[in-house]
Amino acid sequence: MTTKFLTAKDSDLKIAADIIKSGGNVILPTETVYGLGADAFNPNAVKNIFKAKGRPADNPLIAHISNIDMLDELAADVPQAAKRLADKFWPGPLTMIFKKCERVPYETTGGLETIAVRMPDNKTARRLIELAQTPIAAPSANLSGKPSPTTFRHCTEDMNGRVDAIIDGGDCRIGVESTVIDMSGEKPVLLRPGDVTAEQLSEILGNVEVVTSVKDGEKPKSPGLKYKHYSPDADVVILSGNVDEVKNFIARQSKVHKCGMLVFDEFPKFDAQEIISLGSLKNPQSAMHRLFTALREMDERGVEIIFAPEISEKERWRAVHNRLYRAAGEKVLNLSDSAAVSDFEIGTEKNVLDADSETKDESRAKKVLFVCTGNTCRSPMAEGLFNYECKKRGIEAVAESAGLFADESAVSRNSAAVMREIGIDISNHRSRQLTPEMIDKADLVLVMTASHKMTILSAFLSKKIDDKVFTFSDYLGTPSEVPDPFGGDETVYRTCRDKLAELIDKVLNKGF
């Protein structure tokens, strides 16, 4: 696909609007982050958003509108409290969730009966929506799980060749995604913090409940709730400790790894090889604006581990805290805990030694890596089935599994149940985030869908891995995608298990 690069001139916006009208995808600027847009009422166009990003299908999109009248096309019920919020904060960085109109396709809502809507405070975005004559569904315009794009260059790096057009609207003013509040229930619930704070919302609504994650098995009502988000290729670790503890720890780690440190202007000098300031401790807006660019820049500098300080959860700092801690997978290292520090240092040094000493001994057991979206359903079932069959048949091979967007969650209850039916126990499995090291160590990487493969190849462009990453369809030469059973009952999971068993039997018979 050849991607058009467009300006914010009206003549170019008319080209972009025609692309939207014809079912295409256009990246547009907003005041928060750049968005990957499509006609919110066109299910096929919306599907292409998920394909381009490698985004999980149950992760809902936000529909963007250019005027308040458009809200009636999307929302079946708009409570008076929501109208007061719209009067105060629209256009602006606030997304509200409502019960959806029947016309809104489930592809846009992630299968939910609710729709997320906002009116962006960006003239280019609103003009595009106006010219397209339809609400535009748009998540952030990055590969799913990576830091959101806040510049035109970020978009071209991630999405050139994946979308029809990218509009250059300059740098995003705010730099983190919108605040999301659910107005579809009996009481308002804050689902994602942003530039509009809980305190500001409470001035209009009274008490606002805050929920920023979902329970296992639940569908997320808002982007950013379920899957690992905002993550650079480098590991991100939050450090808890005093200045001397942090200095000494960074100095030791810098002898083993290329380390980066996110700091504030008031901080003393650290010995990390790469240091990027998020601005002043007195200015949360500066930290919001700089955070995603800083994470991306650390990757460009070849940093292996990014260390960051603890962040307050007060007012606007809550948004910075949310994004940074999600990027870290909630990993916080307490430097006062000598055992935890020792475990961390031993673990990182062992990884270096393992990488240096590993050989390609042909007599070793072959390693197969199964990959799905969250590593809680399909891939752990595949891992269990493969290892069971290899042991039964005397085949010297071993399987592991990982997810594109995993956060150490337990295996899904239904997956464990249907595997237990055939005598395989996967109940102790915890989801693992896919890493370059996992791919390096595998002889064969089998993924569930073409979208998974595309996401992996795009995310690890620096590695030549297209000779080991396959869908079952590619590897076996027959149409064999494995649909996600997430949200289904045990019958759906049983069907998925049996499909995987059939495919793994064919893989073992073919050899690798």
Which residues fall in each region the model found?
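Active-site-adjacent structural elements in enzyme catalytic cores
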Residues: M1-V341
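Short helix-capping segments at alpha-helix termini
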Residues: P56, C390-E396, L461-I465
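S-adenosyl-L-methionine/SAH cofactor-binding core of RNA-modifying enzymes
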Residues: D244-V263, I426-A442, L446, K453-M454
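Conserved active-site segments centered on acidic
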Residues: D361-K441, N509-F512
